[in-house]
Design a protein with these regions (language model features):
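Catalytic machinery of carbohydrate-active enzymes
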Residues: 1-294
Length: 294
Protein backbone atom coordinates (compact mmCIF):
# COMPACT_ATOMS: atom_id res chain seq x y z
CA UNK A 1 0.00 0.00 0.00
CA UNK A 2 1.30 3.45 -0.94
CA UNK A 3 0.99 5.82 2.02
CA UNK A 4 1.75 9.43 1.13
CA UNK A 5 0.95 10.88 4.55
CA UNK A 6 1.96 8.84 7.60
CA UNK A 7 -0.69 8.66 10.31
CA UNK A 8 -0.20 10.14 13.75
CA UNK A 9 -0.98 7.87 16.70
CA UNK A 10 -1.27 8.76 20.39
CA UNK A 11 -1.09 6.01 23.03
CA UNK A 12 -1.93 6.70 26.66
CA UNK A 13 -1.27 4.67 29.80
CA UNK A 14 -1.11 6.90 32.84
CA UNK A 15 0.64 4.63 35.37
CA UNK A 16 2.11 2.74 37.15
CA UNK A 17 5.63 1.80 36.06
CA UNK A 18 4.83 -1.88 35.55
CA UNK A 19 1.64 -1.05 33.67
CA UNK A 20 3.46 1.35 31.35
CA UNK A 21 6.09 -1.31 30.66
CA UNK A 22 3.19 -3.67 29.84
CA UNK A 23 2.10 -1.19 27.16
CA UNK A 24 5.46 -1.17 25.34
CA UNK A 25 4.53 -4.19 23.25
CA UNK A 26 1.41 -2.42 22.02
CA UNK A 27 3.50 0.47 20.73
CA UNK A 28 6.01 -1.85 19.06
CA UNK A 29 3.27 -3.75 17.25
CA UNK A 30 1.56 -0.52 16.19
CA UNK A 31 4.84 0.53 14.59
CA UNK A 32 4.96 -2.80 12.76
CA UNK A 33 1.37 -2.43 11.56
CA UNK A 34 1.78 1.24 10.58
CA UNK A 35 5.46 1.31 9.65
CA UNK A 36 5.62 4.98 8.72
CA UNK A 37 3.41 6.18 11.56
CA UNK A 38 4.41 8.84 14.06
CA UNK A 39 3.66 7.44 17.51
CA UNK A 40 3.52 9.62 20.60
CA UNK A 41 2.84 8.46 24.16
CA UNK A 42 1.31 10.18 27.17
CA UNK A 43 2.01 8.94 30.70
CA UNK A 44 3.12 9.85 34.21
CA UNK A 45 6.05 7.45 33.89
CA UNK A 46 8.02 9.09 31.10
CA UNK A 47 11.25 7.32 32.03
CA UNK A 48 9.88 3.98 30.81
CA UNK A 49 9.95 5.31 27.24
CA UNK A 50 13.54 6.56 27.33
CA UNK A 51 15.52 5.31 24.29
CA UNK A 52 12.42 3.65 22.80
CA UNK A 53 12.94 3.61 19.00
CA UNK A 54 9.25 3.27 18.17
CA UNK A 55 8.04 6.63 19.49
CA UNK A 56 8.41 10.20 18.29
CA UNK A 57 7.48 12.19 21.40
CA UNK A 58 6.40 11.55 24.97
CA UNK A 59 4.16 13.78 27.05
CA UNK A 60 3.26 13.94 30.72
CA UNK A 61 -0.42 13.36 31.52
CA UNK A 62 -0.57 16.83 33.07
CA UNK A 63 0.43 18.41 29.76
CA UNK A 64 -0.93 16.18 26.99
CA UNK A 65 -1.12 17.16 23.32
CA UNK A 66 -4.54 17.87 21.74
CA UNK A 67 -6.16 14.57 20.77
CA UNK A 68 -7.57 16.17 17.62
CA UNK A 69 -4.01 16.37 16.28
CA UNK A 70 -4.00 12.58 15.91
CA UNK A 71 -5.57 10.18 13.45
CA UNK A 72 -5.70 7.37 16.01
CA UNK A 73 -5.95 7.64 19.80
CA UNK A 74 -5.55 4.52 21.96
CA UNK A 75 -6.30 4.96 25.66
CA UNK A 76 -4.98 2.00 27.64
CA UNK A 77 -6.07 3.35 31.03
CA UNK A 78 -8.19 0.72 32.82
CA UNK A 79 -7.73 -1.69 29.91
CA UNK A 80 -7.06 -4.67 32.16
CA UNK A 81 -8.73 -3.22 35.24
CA UNK A 82 -12.05 -3.34 33.39
CA UNK A 83 -11.34 -6.82 31.98
CA UNK A 84 -9.31 -8.60 34.67
CA UNK A 85 -10.08 -12.21 33.79
CA UNK A 86 -7.70 -12.01 30.83
CA UNK A 87 -3.95 -11.68 30.90
CA UNK A 88 -3.34 -8.02 31.67
CA UNK A 89 -1.24 -7.43 28.55
CA UNK A 90 -3.79 -9.29 26.41
CA UNK A 91 -6.48 -6.84 27.54
CA UNK A 92 -4.27 -3.94 26.46
CA UNK A 93 -3.70 -5.54 23.08
CA UNK A 94 -7.41 -6.18 22.64
CA UNK A 95 -8.19 -2.51 23.18
CA UNK A 96 -5.61 -1.55 20.56
CA UNK A 97 -6.04 -4.30 17.97
CA UNK A 98 -9.08 -6.41 18.81
CA UNK A 99 -8.54 -10.16 18.87
CA UNK A 100 -5.01 -10.79 17.65
CA UNK A 101 -2.04 -13.15 17.59
CA UNK A 102 0.64 -10.47 17.80
CA UNK A 103 3.80 -10.55 19.91
CA UNK A 104 2.77 -9.56 23.45
CA UNK A 105 6.28 -9.34 24.92
CA UNK A 106 7.44 -6.16 26.65
CA UNK A 107 10.67 -4.27 26.04
CA UNK A 108 13.06 -1.68 27.44
CA UNK A 109 16.11 -0.16 25.76
CA UNK A 110 19.28 0.46 27.79
CA UNK A 111 21.93 2.54 26.05
CA UNK A 112 25.71 2.21 26.23
CA UNK A 113 25.94 4.47 29.28
CA UNK A 114 23.33 2.36 31.09
CA UNK A 115 25.27 -0.81 30.37
CA UNK A 116 28.57 0.70 31.47
CA UNK A 117 27.08 1.88 34.77
CA UNK A 118 25.69 -1.58 35.54
CA UNK A 119 28.88 -3.33 34.46
CA UNK A 120 30.91 -1.14 36.82
CA UNK A 121 28.46 -1.87 39.65
CA UNK A 122 28.86 -5.60 39.05
CA UNK A 123 32.68 -5.66 39.04
CA UNK A 124 32.96 -6.33 42.80
CA UNK A 125 29.83 -8.52 42.79
CA UNK A 126 30.88 -11.08 40.22
CA UNK A 127 28.73 -12.95 37.73
CA UNK A 128 26.85 -15.29 40.05
CA UNK A 129 23.94 -13.39 41.49
CA UNK A 130 20.17 -13.30 41.61
CA UNK A 131 18.08 -10.14 41.57
CA UNK A 132 15.38 -9.97 44.22
CA UNK A 133 12.65 -7.41 44.84
CA UNK A 134 11.43 -7.65 48.43
CA UNK A 135 8.54 -5.25 48.01
CA UNK A 136 7.34 -3.09 50.92
CA UNK A 137 4.99 -0.35 49.74
CA UNK A 138 1.30 0.26 49.11
CA UNK A 139 -1.08 -2.74 48.77
CA UNK A 140 -0.27 -5.07 51.65
CA UNK A 141 -1.18 -8.17 49.66
CA UNK A 142 1.91 -7.63 47.52
CA UNK A 143 4.29 -7.17 50.46
CA UNK A 144 5.51 -10.69 51.12
CA UNK A 145 6.45 -10.98 54.78
CA UNK A 146 10.05 -11.09 55.90
CA UNK A 147 9.28 -14.37 57.66
CA UNK A 148 8.84 -15.91 54.21
CA UNK A 149 11.96 -14.27 52.81
CA UNK A 150 14.15 -15.30 55.76
CA UNK A 151 12.91 -18.88 55.51
CA UNK A 152 13.72 -18.96 51.79
CA UNK A 153 17.25 -17.65 52.31
CA UNK A 154 17.86 -20.07 55.19
CA UNK A 155 17.10 -22.95 52.83
CA UNK A 156 19.20 -21.54 50.00
CA UNK A 157 22.28 -20.67 52.04
CA UNK A 158 22.00 -23.87 54.03
CA UNK A 159 23.05 -25.77 50.92
CA UNK A 160 25.25 -23.29 49.04
CA UNK A 161 26.74 -19.81 49.30
CA UNK A 162 28.30 -19.46 45.85
CA UNK A 163 26.02 -16.62 44.72
CA UNK A 164 24.92 -13.18 45.88
CA UNK A 165 21.53 -11.52 46.22
CA UNK A 166 21.14 -8.08 44.66
CA UNK A 167 18.17 -6.30 46.21
CA UNK A 168 16.35 -3.81 43.98
CA UNK A 169 13.37 -1.52 44.37
CA UNK A 170 12.73 1.68 46.29
CA UNK A 171 13.89 3.01 49.63
CA UNK A 172 10.94 1.46 51.48
CA UNK A 173 11.58 -2.02 50.09
CA UNK A 174 13.38 -4.61 52.19
CA UNK A 175 17.11 -5.24 52.28
CA UNK A 176 19.06 -7.65 54.50
CA UNK A 177 22.36 -6.61 56.07
CA UNK A 178 24.50 -9.64 55.27
CA UNK A 179 27.75 -10.16 53.29
CA UNK A 180 25.93 -12.12 50.57
CA UNK A 181 23.42 -9.30 49.97
CA UNK A 182 24.07 -6.26 47.79
CA UNK A 183 21.92 -3.14 48.13
CA UNK A 184 20.92 -1.78 44.73
CA UNK A 185 17.70 -0.08 45.82
CA UNK A 186 17.11 3.25 44.08
CA UNK A 187 20.31 2.86 42.08
CA UNK A 188 19.00 1.91 38.64
CA UNK A 189 16.46 3.27 36.20
CA UNK A 190 14.15 0.91 34.32
CA UNK A 191 16.53 0.36 31.42
CA UNK A 192 19.49 -0.26 33.70
CA UNK A 193 17.45 -2.68 35.78
CA UNK A 194 16.55 -4.59 32.63
CA UNK A 195 20.24 -4.86 31.75
CA UNK A 196 21.11 -5.91 35.31
CA UNK A 197 18.54 -8.70 35.05
CA UNK A 198 20.02 -9.76 31.71
CA UNK A 199 23.17 -10.73 33.64
CA UNK A 200 21.36 -12.42 36.54
CA UNK A 201 20.87 -16.11 37.23
CA UNK A 202 17.21 -15.26 37.86
CA UNK A 203 14.83 -12.60 39.16
CA UNK A 204 12.60 -13.23 42.18
CA UNK A 205 9.64 -11.05 43.08
CA UNK A 206 5.97 -10.18 42.85
CA UNK A 207 4.06 -8.07 40.29
CA UNK A 208 5.72 -4.63 40.37
CA UNK A 209 7.84 -2.23 38.36
CA UNK A 210 11.01 -4.30 38.87
CA UNK A 211 9.09 -7.46 37.95
CA UNK A 212 8.15 -5.98 34.58
CA UNK A 213 11.67 -4.64 34.01
CA UNK A 214 12.80 -8.24 34.53
CA UNK A 215 10.09 -9.38 32.13
CA UNK A 216 11.75 -7.25 29.45
CA UNK A 217 15.05 -9.03 30.13
CA UNK A 218 16.26 -12.54 29.40
CA UNK A 219 16.44 -13.46 33.10
CA UNK A 220 14.43 -16.47 34.29
CA UNK A 221 11.71 -15.32 36.67
CA UNK A 222 10.46 -16.84 39.91
CA UNK A 223 7.08 -15.14 40.30
CA UNK A 224 5.56 -15.04 43.78
CA UNK A 225 1.84 -14.38 43.45
CA UNK A 226 -0.95 -13.50 45.86
CA UNK A 227 -4.05 -11.65 44.65
CA UNK A 228 -3.34 -11.86 40.90
CA UNK A 229 -3.91 -15.17 39.09
CA UNK A 230 -0.95 -16.89 37.46
CA UNK A 231 -2.57 -16.78 34.03
CA UNK A 232 -3.00 -13.00 34.25
CA UNK A 233 0.51 -11.87 35.09
CA UNK A 234 3.32 -14.15 33.88
CA UNK A 235 5.10 -12.31 31.06
CA UNK A 236 4.93 -13.26 27.40
CA UNK A 237 8.31 -14.19 25.93
CA UNK A 238 9.05 -15.86 22.63
CA UNK A 239 5.26 -15.78 22.09
CA UNK A 240 4.72 -18.05 25.11
CA UNK A 241 3.05 -16.85 28.30
CA UNK A 242 5.32 -17.75 31.20
CA UNK A 243 8.32 -18.77 29.09
CA UNK A 244 11.31 -19.41 31.41
CA UNK A 245 9.21 -18.52 34.46
CA UNK A 246 8.23 -20.49 37.56
CA UNK A 247 5.13 -19.30 39.40
CA UNK A 248 4.75 -19.93 43.13
CA UNK A 249 1.31 -18.75 44.28
CA UNK A 250 0.32 -18.21 47.89
CA UNK A 251 -1.20 -21.23 49.63
CA UNK A 252 -4.30 -19.26 50.66
CA UNK A 253 -7.41 -20.73 49.04
CA UNK A 254 -8.59 -17.25 48.01
CA UNK A 255 -5.48 -16.60 45.89
CA UNK A 256 -6.13 -14.79 42.64
CA UNK A 257 -8.98 -12.78 44.16
CA UNK A 258 -8.27 -9.84 41.84
CA UNK A 259 -10.88 -11.25 39.47
CA UNK A 260 -13.53 -11.00 42.19
CA UNK A 261 -13.13 -7.26 42.76
CA UNK A 262 -15.53 -4.58 41.55
CA UNK A 263 -14.83 -3.39 38.00
CA UNK A 264 -12.80 -1.52 37.06
CA UNK A 265 -10.41 -2.91 39.66
CA UNK A 266 -8.84 0.28 40.98
CA UNK A 267 -9.55 -0.46 44.65
CA UNK A 268 -8.75 -3.89 46.06
CA UNK A 269 -10.38 -5.29 49.21
CA UNK A 270 -9.30 -8.39 51.14
CA UNK A 271 -12.39 -10.36 52.19
CA UNK A 272 -10.44 -11.73 55.16
CA UNK A 273 -9.31 -8.26 56.14
CA UNK A 274 -5.76 -9.25 57.07
CA UNK A 275 -4.09 -10.21 53.75
CA UNK A 276 -2.83 -13.57 55.06
CA UNK A 277 -1.76 -14.42 51.50
CA UNK A 278 1.47 -12.48 51.89
CA UNK A 279 2.66 -14.75 54.71
CA UNK A 280 1.50 -18.15 53.48
CA UNK A 281 3.87 -19.63 50.91
CA UNK A 282 5.46 -22.99 50.28
CA UNK A 283 8.97 -21.88 51.21
CA UNK A 284 10.51 -25.10 49.91
CA UNK A 285 8.86 -24.52 46.51
CA UNK A 286 10.32 -21.02 46.29
CA UNK A 287 13.80 -22.21 47.25
CA UNK A 288 13.63 -25.13 44.82
CA UNK A 289 12.57 -22.80 42.00
CA UNK A 290 15.50 -20.48 42.66
CA UNK A 291 17.95 -23.38 42.99
CA UNK A 292 16.89 -24.66 39.56
CA UNK A 293 18.46 -21.54 38.04
CA UNK A 294 21.68 -21.47 40.09
Amino acid sequence: MKIETPINILVRRRAAIGDVIMSTGVVRELKKQYEQANIDVVTEKLAVWRNNPHIRNMYHVNDPPPIENYDLYINLDNAYEANPVNHFVDSMFYRAFGDNVLDHSVELFPDAADCQLVDEFLEPVGNRFIVVHMRNWHYAQKNISMDVWFAVYARLFGSRTDFKVICVGGSTDYMIDHPLFVDAREQFNDQQLKYLCDQALCFVGIDSGPYWAAAASKAPIVALLTNIPVESILPHRKRVMGYDCIAVPTLEECRGCYNEQQRPVVIWTCKKGTTPCNNNFDVAAIATAIESYL
